[in-house]
Amino acid sequence: QHPTVQKMIDSFIEQYKGQADFDITLEAQPDSTTRDVLLGDVQNGADVFSFPDDQLSAMVAGGALAPVPNVQEVKDKMVAESVAAATVGDTLYAYPMTADNGYFLYYNKDYFTEDDVKTLDSILAVCEENGKKLSMELNSGWYMYSFFGNTGLSMNINEDGITNSCDWNTVDGDIKGLDVAEAIVNVISSPGFVSQPDGEWVAKAADGEVIAAVSGVWQAVAVKNIWGDDYGACKLPTYTCNGRQIQMASFTGYKMVGVNYYSKNKDWAFKLAQWLTNEQNQTLRFVEQNQGPSNKVAAASEEVAKVPAIAAVIEQSQYGVLQRIG
């Protein structure tokens, strides 16, 4: 993403030239470690930084984020779910940047029809018949949630913002945790299923072993290169649990741009954060990085709708929830 972001910075400097002398340094930082790096030395941290929504609570608790000043403008321009993801209590703490950080089903259309991918049972049956695999990183809690999320069972962060509550071991209700566990055992017992790290299945797709996988948009370019015109993507299927079909859930995810509470140039930092997330640059990010926009206008474009992975993550989002775990 480095060259893309640098283009945005260059256009920002051009837009505001003559109004200030800019010295903007772009440093690469994995999203997964932004929180830890910033909170480790927040007073000397970056003025402007991007991060995924599941780090927001910790950032706010650590006093790292300056509240967004132009809240109504952001609400008017961004999809509501992305604004909610950047909000704690009644305070908006960051500018939404992307709306695609969830997961869905990739599949090879050479093997599956649109009806085949509606249920996990039929997906596994096709895999078994062809000696192929459905891949999913089942030892990851992020993906494991998909089996529990739409069962009436819950897992949430408590009001303290640190501890969690979870009732997956309940003995009450139509669907119990044991029912879900038994359903998962049935899935992994299929010779058509393989659990492996998300980063490994693409290589297995390239050698023909994997023909379907639960993953996210970050693999879209690689999958398109491997499967070509047979590249398909859609919402997650239903699965069999306690004699019924249950729609698999997901964690939805959003990325955003925040401003350091301790920035010595806060006004300009807010201008840059807003610039990096405006319609123009969300469109640029989509074109060059295939990342789904949170800006309403950019997200509604025909070009976005034509990308199977983006369309799939949007379709799946109605069955997902924000990841809010301590």
Outline where the language-model segments fall.
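Hinge/lid segment of periplasmic solute-binding proteins
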Residues: 53-103, 115, 121, 232-236, ...
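C-terminal capping/gating helix-and-loop segments adjacent to ligand/active sites or protein-protein/ligand interfaces
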Residues: 251, 288-292, 309-326
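Short helix-initiation/N-cap motifs at beta->coil->alpha
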Residues: 27-37, 120, 193-206
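Extracytoplasmic/periplasmic solute-binding protein
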Residues: 91-97, 103, 122-169, 210
